UniProtKB/Swiss-Prot annotation:
SUPFAM superfamilies the UniProt entry points to: MFS general substrate transporter
Gene (name only): SLC16A8
Protein name in the entry: Monocarboxylate transporter 3
PANTHER family: MONOCARBOXYLATE TRANSPORTER, MONOCARBOXYLATE TRANSPORTER 3
Result, substituting residue 471 to A: Abolishes basolateral membrane localization
Lineage, uppermost ranks: Eukaryota, Metazoa, Chordata, Craniata, Vertebrata
Biological source species: Homo sapiens
Residue segments, region Basolateral sorting signal: 450-484, 485-504
Tissue expression: Retinal pigment epithelium.
Length: 504
């Protein structure tokens, strides 16, 4: 019997080994989101040793974040081809090697290639597979699981920032990078526990063709994506798409992608600039580094609390609007705190920012999972991360350039806050429009775009189609179905009989 993933027709276990997977996802998320921000405590030393401006130095974090997001489609393809566990093990080695090599860098370009490209790629190859595996283990408790996993970011941020400051003071930035590279090897341990969820044997209707459980000679599996297709006839061979670009035609996905682009332009800027902003305001180095810890401490509480709140039956259908509210609150926090200069005002900003930032972090992937469904989530996540990469390459470096030119942080906070607030308003308005259009338009049979699985298989050649997702009441609109059912929709289960029928 293959171990590629859960058997069709069986829902996620919502527990068991899933809690171990959740713990690993917690660690990976912490490294992925906390590491690029924590590296900012080394910027002053890098600026001095390389005689560079802040904008040039900030490219290290920006490239790291861009690789984390921009290689999303690559990660999706690798997960579909090789599975979650091998990809995460390779990613952990790459992330560690990048920081170790960066400790020997003599030019900024070498830092860009090592700490930026290699470490960013390694983090990406850990982050996306961990989210995919988390979705395989949790369905009913998925909002809570997402919130708990997302709490890894503030926990690690609150720990890595002071740790980086201590390493910088004791060993210099080179010794600090070397030790942080060793710390990233924990990603390999996280990848090792990412085994596919167990499942029962195939459904009885598939046994009627004469194949016994686990003995089908044409069994094809996708280890990490949790997809398992069995050939019922050697003459018809279903093929799997390594990256499902058809998700781009989905209204819900388009709304989410635009929202994430606007959000990423400004969301990370305050956190990246915060330490140096405080230092320029006369705050001691240790106290300035502790500001990120304050953000992290508040974020730790906000993420699981918001995840549990979003899992309530009455609120879960309205998760997109909660996400919009979180974005709006984050943007308004930046706008109202642009003139903060005293340490007390900066602490108040960190508390408000950590609360809204935690809400965004807890809800962002839950909204995407609910919008596109589990079967298309790997491809959708990869494409969304690619969109975010473009915004990350624009936002923080542009902010750093403005700081160098204007010597003023105030306009940076105004710009960042406006972008994030605009993302929240757009998400709410566009979601409402999609829901209204879906209610007004008659529902048609089949999926949009029209081609059948067998036609796709013949056209793709070397790719194998993902399982068909039955047409729901419009993806984002399908969230409203939750209010009547009290639990999430499972479009992939509805589509399974069709897949079995077409393969005969």
């Amino acid at each position: 019997m293959g171990a590629g993933g859960p058997r069709r027709g069986e829902g996620p276990p919502d527990g068991g080994w899933g809690w171990v997977v959740l713990g690993a996802c917690f660690v990976v998320t912490g490294f992925a989101y906390g590491f690029p921000k924590a590296v900012s405590v080394f910027f002053r030393a890098l600026m001095r040793d390389f005689d560079a401006g802040y904008s040039d130095t900030a490219w290290v974090s920006s490239i790291m974040l861009a690789m984390l997001y921009g290689t999303g489609p690559v990660s999706s393809i690798l997960v579909t081809r090789f599975g979650c566990r091998p990809v995460m093990l390779a990613g952990g080695l790459l992330a560690s090697a990048g920081m170790i090599l960066a400790s020997f860098a003599t030019r900024l370009l070498e830092l860009y290639l090592t700490a930026g490209v290699l470490t960013g790629l390694g983090l990406a190859l850990n982050f996306q597979p961990s989210l995919i595996m988390l979705g395989l283990y949790f369905e009913r408790r998925r909002p809570l699981a997402n919130g708990l996993a997302a709490a890894g970011s503030p926990v690690f941020l609150s720990a890595l920032s002071p740790l980086g400051q201590q390493l910088l003071e004791r060993f210099g930035w080179r010794g600090g990078f070397l030790l942080l590279g060793g710390l990233l090897l924990h990603c390999c341990a996280c990848g090792a526990v990412m085994r596919p969820p167990p499942g029962p044997g195939p459904r009885p209707r598939r046994d009627s063709a004469g194949d016994r459980a686990g003995d089908a000679p044409g069994e094809a599996e996708a280890d990490g994506a949790g997809l398992q297709l069995r050939e019922a006839s050697p003459r018809v061979r279903p093929r799997r798409r390594l990256l499902d670009l058809a998700v781009c035609t989905d209204r819900a996905f388009a709304v989410y992608a635009v929202t994430k682009f606007l959000m990423a332009l400004g969301l990370f800027v305050p956190a990246i600039l915060l330490v140096n902003y405080a230092k320029d305001a006369g705050v001691p180095d240790t106290d300035a580094a502790f500001l990120l810890s304050i953000v992290g401490f508040v974020d730790i509480v906000a993420r699981p609390a918001c995840g549990a709140l979003a899992g309530l039956a009455r609120l879960r259908p309205h998760v997109p609007y909660l996400f919009s509210l979180a974005l709006l609150a984050n943007g308004l926090t930046d706008l109202s705190s642009a003139r903060a200069r005293s340490y007390g005002a900066l602490v108040a900003f960190c508390v408000a920012f950590g609360l809204s930032y935690g809400m965004v972090g807890a809800l962002q992937f839950e909204v995407l999972m609910a919008a596109v469904g589990a079967p298309r989530f790997p491809s959708a996540l990869g494409l969304v991360l690619l969109v975010e990469a473009a915004a990350v390459l624009i936002g923080p470096p542009s902010a750093g350039r403005l700081v160098d030119v204007l010597k003023n942080y105030e306009i940076i906070f105004y710009l960042a806050g406006s972008e994030v607030a605009l993302a929240g308003v757009f998400m709410a308005v566009a979601t409402n429009c999609c829901l209204r259009c879906a209610k007004a338009a008659p529902s048609g049979p089949g999926t949009e775009g029209g081609a059948s699985d067998t036609e796709d298989a013949e056209a793709e050649g070397d790719s194998e189609p993902l399982p068909v997702v039955a047409e729901e009441p419009g993806n984002l609109e399908a969230l409203e179905v939750l209010s009547a059912r009290g639990e999430p929709t499972e479009p992939e289960i509805e589509a399974r009989p069709r897949l079995a029928a077409e393969s005969v």
